[in-house]
């Protein structure tokens, strides 16, 4: 696989001007400008496997989520007869408890589904994952969180309670800590199991990155609960954009704050200093407002990069996927890169740079790939062009249009960044590859039955499978690192989020 990829890589990059190669010093020192800007060599030959733990495998039924664990996620009230959903359940059929949920429609109600996937399930499938030939793992968020997706953190410093073997014991450990003091942080059973998994993957020559959102938390995040309790006197009050404080004299929770996407109460966003203040178009100059918030994020980052803090990052993760990265001011990312590279000069930073204006305008990533922020992005721009040609889907491309499109998105990129791109065909946020090709409408637009009753959700036909094979050949021989969304290797199909999960 590697020789053919290198051969096609050589052909594909003719006409690009590569930047000078830079060697990283593998020692704890302030990174020089050159070492800070370099792209980790291992990322250029990576084959990524993306794991969404809650939906991967249930290896330990004793840690399955309960309604109490889900408190703070949508929907708010879980019926008494709620149970975890059995594996193999028909996605569009209703569990006995589903219609008891007071929520608007099927897609709102299934946010309460839990399958019980956990880290033991990942550990049990190590041989299977290795057999796929992958060399790097991208974990969707693992931080403690009440939701199925974990982008609404309760606690950044710990692995989700239901991903480890002792949820109740882990909660006791977390509750005993001073959350803003890293000196008090302990290792929960879930934390230890994750570190074991990192070690096992490393023994097999497989790298590991974690997914974090430094843009927002969940409504039950410990700092927001402190604001809920102490109001204006909370020392974390400058972390968020607080609109109204809670009135402790009433039973109602009156706390209001800016949420992701506007008024989403389940994902409060951090306060940012945008330069200029009225700038509404990404990317943004500026920074996160609170210095104590940044230091907390940096402490969590160091914790996973070098768990025993001995100066050798071999026991830690190999980088981070950065959620909704374009919504966070670039000044923060410049600081963040320095923190990460100080601990591990070979750590990989990949940003989720996607929409400028949904559903048809994608954000130009060049400003993020100047050596001071990320090494690469999730390359949805590449997939749109590849789908238009190999799948003859909207926007349909001729061979000449395909070549023009590929050159258009790549010609201005540093060759090292291009080689490290994660070339994404499907993910937790988009239709699965075969379903995306089976439907010829615009990708990620009206791409599930609730938005388009004509959207095809049945088994893709043989023509689609042939288109899929051609696109995959292109993916594995094109500059960049191919990515597999868990389940794609088994031929799974599915519409847009959440049907793809």
Model-derived regions, located:
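Bacterial N-terminal signal peptides
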Residues: 8-18
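N-terminal structural segment of carbohydrate-active enzymes
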Residues: 27-207
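Loop/helix patches that line or flank the sugar-binding groove of alpha-linked glycan CAZymes
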Residues: 43, 59-107, 355, 404-408, ...
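Aromatic- and acidic-residue-enriched segments that line the glycan-binding/catalytic groove
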Residues: 44, 60-81, 145-165, 214-265, ...
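Conserved, mostly hydrophobic/aromatic
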Residues: 51, 129, 139, 156, ...
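The substrate-binding groove and active-site-proximal loops of carbohydrate-active enzymes
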Residues: 101-121, 154-191, 219, 265-294, ...
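Active-site-proximal helices and loops of the catalytic beta/alpha 8
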Residues: 198, 202, 206, 215-216, ...
């Amino acid at each position: 696989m590697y020789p053919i990829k290198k051969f096609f890589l050589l052909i594909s990059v003719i006409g690009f001007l590569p930047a000078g190669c830079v060697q990283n010093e593998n020692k704890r020192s302030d990174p020089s400008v050159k070492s800070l800007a370099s792209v980790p060599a291992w990322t250029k030959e990576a084959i990524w496997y993306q794991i969404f733990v809650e939906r991967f495998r249930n290896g330990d039924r004793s840690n399955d989520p309960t309604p109490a664990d889900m408190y703070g996620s949508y929907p708010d009230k879980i019926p008494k007869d709620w149970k975890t959903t059995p594996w193999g359940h028909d996605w569009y059929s209703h569990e006995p408890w589903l219609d008891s949920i007071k929520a608007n429609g099927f897609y709102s109600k299934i946010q309460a589904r839990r399958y019980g996937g956990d880290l033991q399930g990942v550990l049990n499938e190590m041989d299977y994952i290795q057999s796929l030939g992958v060399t790097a793992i991208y974990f969707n968020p693992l931080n403690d969180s009440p939701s199925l997706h974990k982008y609404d953190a309760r606690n950044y410093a710990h692995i989700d309670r239901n991903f480890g073997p002792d949820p109740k014991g882990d909660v006791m450990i977390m509750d005993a800590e001073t959350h803003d003091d890293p000196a008090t942080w302990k290792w929960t059973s879930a934390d230890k199991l994750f570190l074991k998994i990192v070690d096992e993957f490393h023994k097999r020559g497989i790298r590991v990155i974690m997914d974090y959102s430094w843009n927002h938390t969940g409504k039950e995040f410990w700092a927001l609960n402190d604001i809920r309790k102490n109001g204006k006197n909370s020392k974390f009050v400058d972390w968020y954009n607080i609109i109204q404080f809670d009135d402790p004299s009433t039973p109602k929770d009156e706390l209001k704050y800016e949420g992701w996407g506007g008024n989403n109460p389940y994902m409060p966003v951090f306060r940012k200093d945008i330069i200029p203040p009225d700038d509404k178009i990404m990317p943004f100059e500026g920074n996160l407002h609170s210095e104590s918030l940044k230091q907390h994020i940096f402490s969590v980052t160091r914790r996973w990069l070098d768990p025993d803090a001995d100066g050798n990052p071999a026991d830690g993760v190999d980088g981070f996927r950065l959620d909704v990265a374009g919504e966070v001011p670039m000044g923060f990312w410049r600081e963040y890169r320095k923190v990460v590279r100080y601990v591990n000069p070979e750590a990989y930073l990949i940003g989720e740079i996607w929409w400028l204006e949904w559903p048809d305008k994608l954000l130009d990533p060049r400003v993020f790939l100047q050596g001071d922020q990320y090494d690469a992005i999730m390359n949805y721009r590449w997939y749109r062009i590849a789908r238009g040609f190999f799948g003859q889907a909207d926007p349909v491309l001729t061979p000449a249009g395909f070549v023009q499109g590929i050159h258009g998105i790549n010609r201005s990129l540093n060759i090292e960044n291009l080689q490290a791109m994660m070339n994404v065909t499907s993910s937790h946020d988009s239709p699965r590859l075969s379903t995306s090709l089976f439907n010829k409408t615009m990708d990620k637009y009206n791409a599930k039955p609730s938005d388009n009753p004509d959207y095809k959700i049945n088994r893709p036909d043989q023509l689609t499978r042939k288109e899929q094979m051609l696109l995959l050949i292109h993916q594995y021989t094109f500059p960049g690192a191919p990515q597999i969304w868990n389940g794609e290797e088994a031929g799974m199909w599915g519409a847009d989020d959440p049907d793809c999960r």
